[in-house]
Every structure is written in C-alpha cells, then in structure tokens.
Amino acid sequence: MLELALGVPSLLSASTLSRPALASSFSNASTLLSFVFFFFFFKDSSPKASAMSSVGSFSASASAETLLDFFFFFFNPANKSSPEPFSLPFTAASKSSGITFLVFFFFFSAGSNPNSAAKSEDISCVLII
C-alpha cells in the first residue's frame, strides 16, 4: 500500500528492475518525502523557511539519480563480470546533484535552529566531498 502511495515499484522481484522506470519512481518518491521532511523542519510561515523548503526538495529529487546509480552498481549482476569493478557509472550531473543536496542539507539544517549556526568545519567537510 505504501509502495503505491509513493510510486515505488516492488523491489523484491528482480525481473521488473529497469533503470528508466525506477528513475522516475525514485524521483517521485524522493520529492514527496523531501516535502514531508522539510515541512516538519520548517513549520513556520516565514519566507526564508519556504524558500529553504523549495530548494531542499528540488535537490533531494535531483539526488535520486545518484542513489539509483549506487543501487544498480552494487546489485546489478552485470557488474560482477565487469573488467573494471571500481568504475562507478556516475554521470557528472548525478555527482553534482548529490553534492548539491549535501551542501543544502548542511546549510539548512544548521540554519533551521536559531540557537545553532553552521560551523566552519561542517562546511569544509561538505566542500571537500
């Protein structure tokens, strides 16, 4: 029932795994979950909170491609006989979207609490990644 609500296909049957179908399903599910996540963290109606919620949900849905690349690299049987087992099939867009999500997560999670501020070591860790 939850799978139908989120648009995620059943991952138990390996015969139904196709990357384009999963990409759209994971993108829809991650967008929905990110809206729920940011709604609970930014409950006030200030313009700053609504802007952070929009940017955060966009970057979360963009990073679904990166999560999908991880899934297909580690669970795809075709990768077992690959001549280059450590060549990850990431595109430049999926790498940048994942890094964008991490940057926004660190900045906005630190900015959501008025008693805390983004620490320089947290930001430098994100920039190194």
Curated annotation (Swiss-Prot):
Keyword annotations of the record: Membrane, Transmembrane, Transmembrane helix
Statement: the UniProt record of this protein carries the keyword tRNA-binding: no
Record localization: Membrane
GO cellular component: membrane
Transmembrane segments: 22-42, 55-75, 88-108
Membrane topology annotation: Multi-pass membrane protein
Additional comment: Almost completely overlaps SUI3.
Descriptive protein name: Putative uncharacterized protein YPL238C
Species for this entry: Saccharomyces cerevisiae (strain ATCC 204508 / S288c) (Baker's yeast)
